[in-house]
Design a protein with these regions (language model features):
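Collagen triple-helix signature
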Residues: 1-190
C-alpha cells in the first residue's frame, strides 16, 4: 500500500514545524511457487526440470518502505535426471525498506537430480538492508540462512549469501547459496 501523507507543519514562530513522516510502504507480495517437473516416460526417460519460483514483489515507498516479498520456493522434479527449479529472487525494498529474502531451492528426489539454487537477495532501499541470500537445495541438512547486513548511516550492507547443502541423492549436486542483496544508499535531504 502507498505511504500515508505527511502531517502539516505547525504555523507561526521563527521556524515552522516540520511535516509528519509518511506512512510505511506496504510489503511486496511473495513470489509464486515453481511447478513440479513431469515424470519420465514409463519410468525410463529423464524427468522434466522443475520451474523457477516467482520473483517477490517490490516493497512500497513511504516514510519507511515495506519489505520486499520473499521469492517463491522451487518444487521438486518427479523422476530421474530432472533438475530442480531455482528459488525466485527476493523483491527490492522501498525507500528505507529491506530487500526480501531469496526463495529456497528444492531437494532432488531421485538419482542424478540436481538440487535447486537459492534465489538472490533483494536490494535494499534508501538506507535499507540488503536481503539475505536464499538457502541452497537440501540434502540431509539445509544450508544456513545468510546473515543480514548492518545499517550504518552510510547505508545498509548487503546480506550474506546462503550456504549450499550437500545432496544425499546419488549424483545430485548441492544447491548454490543465493547472492546477498546490495545495501541501499543514504537518501538525499528533502
Amino acid at each position: 500500500g502507498a505511504g500515508g501523507a505527511g502531517g502539516k507543519g505547525g504555523d507561526g514562530g521563527a521556524q515552522a514545524g516540520d511535516g509528519g513522516a509518511g506512512g510505511a510502504g506496504g510489503k511486496g507480495g511473495n513470489g509464486g511457487n515453481g511447478a513440479t517437473g513431469a515424470t519420465g516416460l514409463n519410468g525410463l526417460g529423464a524427468g522434466a526440470d522443475g520451474t523457477d519460483g516467482g520473483k517477490g514483489g517490490n516493497g512500497g515507498a513511504g516514510g519507511g518502505g515495506g519489505a520486499g516479498g520473499q521469492g517463491g520456493k522451487a518444487l521438486a522434479a518427479t523422476h530421474q535426471d530432472g533438475s530442480m527449479g531455482a528459488g525466485g529472487a527476493g523483491g527490492n525494498g522501498g525507500a528505507g525498506g529491506m530487500g526480501g529474502d531469496g526463495g529456497n531451492g528444492a531437494k532432488g528426489t531421485f538419482d542424478n537430480g540436481g538440487d535447486g539454487v537459492g534465489g538472490n537477495g533483494g536490494n535494499g532501499g534508501s538506507r535499507g538492508i540488503g536481503g539475505a541470500g536464499g538457502i541452497g537445495g537440501a540434502g540431509s541438512t539445509a544450508g544456513a540462512d545468510g546473515a543480514r547486513g548492518a545499517t550504518p548511516t552510510s547505508g545498509g550492507n548487503g546480506g550474506t549469501g546462503g550456504n549450499g547443502a550437500n545432496a544425499t541423492v546419488a549424483g545430485g549436486a548441492g544447491g548454490a547459496g543465493g547472492k546477498g542483496g546490495n545495501g541501499g544508499l543514504v537518501g538525499n535531504g528533502g
